[in-house]
UniProtKB/Swiss-Prot annotation:
Probable non-functional open reading frame (ORF) of V region of the variable domain of T cell receptor (TR) beta chain. Non-functional ORF generally cannot participate in the synthesis of a productive T cell receptor (TR) chain due to altered V-(D)-J or switch recombination and/or splicing site (at mRNA level) and/or conserved amino acid change (protein level). Alpha-beta T cell receptors are antigen specific receptors which are essential to the immune response and are present on the cell surface of T lymphocytes. GO terms for biological process: adaptive immune response; cell surface receptor signaling pathway. It comes from the Eukaryota. It comes from Homo sapiens. The lineage of its organism: Eukaryota, Metazoa, Chordata, Craniata, Vertebrata. Residues 22-115 form the Ig-like domain. This is Probable non-functional T cell receptor beta variable 7-3.
Length: 115
């Protein structure tokens, strides 16, 4: 049962669903210099109202950053407040901005959406 749960959780984080549609990310990867600003965009699955951002550093599990329900942030308790900003102004596309990147920001930034 543990393996099934792990596979299900991985599919949810990747935004997979039974129709083959998924959460899209722009850009798919980004390399930048220390001190530069980065902007990541998430387009959720059509009709999904909830959107989640996670960060996964090398060798670590996913770390929750922020959760949106519609246009508002329902829980931003994991989002570092000094240089990280996330918005979802129209209840669809969300943008995560990281200002003045640092070495510790190097990670996979994951998005998920749900009904």
């Amino acid at each position: 049962m543990g393996t099934r749960l792990l596979c299900w959780a991985a599919l949810c984080l990747l935004g997979a669903d039974h129709t083959g549609a998924g959460v899209s990310q722009t850009p798919s990867n980004k390399v930048t210099e220390k001190g530069k600003d980065v902007e990541l965009r998430c387009d959720p699955i059509s009709g999904h109202t909830a959107l989640y951002w996670y960060r996964q550093s090398l060798g670590q599990g996913p770390e929750f950053l922020i959760y949106f329900q519609g246009t508002g942030a329902a829980d931003d308790s994991g989002l570092p407040k000094d240089r990280f900003f996330a918005v979802r102004p129209e209840g669809s596309v969300s943008t995560l901005k990281i200002q003045r990147t640092e070495q510790g920001d190097s990670a996979a930034y994951l998005r998920a959406s749900s009904l």
